[in-house]
Amino acid sequence: MAGMAPEGSQFDAKHYDSKMQELLNQGETEEFFTSYDEVHESFDDMGLQENLLRGIYAYGFEKPSAIQQRGIVPFCKGLDVIQQAQSGTGKTATFCSGILQQLDYAVVECQALVLAPTRELAQQIEKVMRALGDYLGVKVHACVGGTSVREDQRILASGVHVVVGTPGRVFDMLRRQSLRPDYIKMFVLDEADEMLSRGFKDQIYDIFQLLPSKIQVGVFSATMPPEALEITRKFMNKPVRILVKRDELTLEGIKQFYVNVEKEEWKLDTLCDLYETLAITQSVIFVNTRRKVDWLTDKMRGRDHTVSATHGDMDQNTRDIIMREFRSGSSRVLITTDLLARGIDVQQVSLVINYDLPTQPENYLHRIGRSGRFGRKGVAINFVTRDDERMLFDIQRFYNVVIEELPANVADLL
């Protein structure tokens, strides 16, 4: 089914590779990037403060993941870093540790600013930062849209060490001078591929203009399109590069399958047939539009299947409640869109269903990286209509993976 490139395939892997090569081969590139290959196989070998180590171990980390083994120390040294690793490999804890190691806790001023593309992801980073910094007494605040501006201003006025937020609200706080940039010495872009997409690029530039000229910059991402690398040149000073080649973006530990559903209308019955299997574990179902989230939720509930749903049109409070229920396990099947893929950090998720295939190969990683987090096993099931065959081919070529047809014994895989 996916053995040959359909004509007119939207994604051209050769073009991607040649653009990346062209960028990395430019005359000044060698001066711009330096590679960083030092590996620290234990958190104890990284020279971290005792109370930060306590927080790391209390959070449940035992051994650093590959990106943490290479990424924490250069950030702690104050170097500008570009780091690429798939979702679920511990990127967030990498930059949180680097920030927490360098803060001056006696100075209750904002010293680190972290930007994220969605409210959910910003709030997730805030939680990780607070947990890892529990024994250090770190003060963190998430500035995101859909919450009270006055409350943000009150908390910022009382003093924080770290602000995490979405670009719109952070820029608003800087513009109102509620967030003072004078002490900011670290600036992190998380999920930079999304952040630097056209929607956020201008806001990030505006924010960067307001920050002190001497600042450490960290760029973290699961995928690193050439455009993102190009933009980092404007922000960064001789960064070290910890970059996974595209063919090394393995989705290790995640078994991937497709179900040939032929037509769009047949997807619902296929999902209902799978529902008993889904409810064994925690599952996330991705569709491509907010309207479809509502439609599928209604259809599933109409057939007496318990599901919860979240998308960007819901108010923040409702989304928070739904995510809390899902994290606690009281709701087990969540229907959502790409927009929120990056804010779902639920350790128990072991099944992701792409009811709709993503419209871009890059988003596939963000979606299915929700399962099999930190080495746990995960399963991804892709519903594929005739119209989707081209995208399935593109995804396999982009990640250098083979996606097999779903076997009958799917329950045994979970």
UniProtKB/Swiss-Prot annotation:
Q: Which InterPro entries match?
A: DEAD/DEAH_box_helicase_dom, Helicase_ATP-bd, Helicase_C-like, P-loop_NTPase, RNA-helicase_DEAD-box_CS, RNA_helicase_DEAD_Q_motif
- Which reactions does this protein catalyse? ATP + H2O = ADP + phosphate + H(+)
Q: Which PROSITE patterns match?
A: DEAD_ATP_HELICASE, HELICASE_ATP_BIND_1, HELICASE_CTER, Q_MOTIF
Instruction: Name the SMART domains for this protein.
Output: DEXDc (SM00487), HELICc (SM00490)
* Any one annotated GO CC term: cytoplasmic stress granule
Asked whether the keyword Protein biosynthesis is assigned, the reply is yes
> What is one Gene Ontology biological process annotated in the Swiss-Prot or TrEMBL record?
cytoplasmic translational initiation
Q: Name one GO molecular function term.
A: translation initiation factor activity
Q: What is its EC number?
A: 3.6.4.13
**Key words of the record:** ATP-binding, Helicase, Hydrolase, Initiation factor, Nucleotide-binding, Protein biosynthesis, RNA-binding
Tell me which residues make up the Helicase ATP-binding domain: 72-242
Q: Where is this motif: Q motif?
A: 41-69
**Which residue numbers delimit the Helicase C-terminal domain?**
253-414
Amino-acid biosynthesis in keyword set = no
TM segment ranges = none
Q: Where is this motif: DEAD box?
A: 190-193
Q: Which residues bind ATP?
A: 85-92
Role played: ATP-dependent RNA helicase which is a subunit of the eIF4F complex involved in cap recognition and is required for mRNA binding to ribosome. In the current model of translation initiation, eIF4A unwinds RNA secondary structures in the 5'-UTR of mRNAs which is necessary to allow efficient binding of the small ribosomal subunit, and subsequent scanning for the initiator codon.
The UniProt entry's sequence similarity note says: Belongs to the DEAD box helicase family. eIF4A subfamily.
Provide the assembly information.
eIF4F is a multi-subunit complex, the composition of which varies with external and internal environmental conditions. It is composed of at least EIF4A, EIF4E and EIF4G.
The protein's name is Eukaryotic initiation factor 4A-1
Which organism is this entry from? Oryza sativa subsp. japonica (Rice)
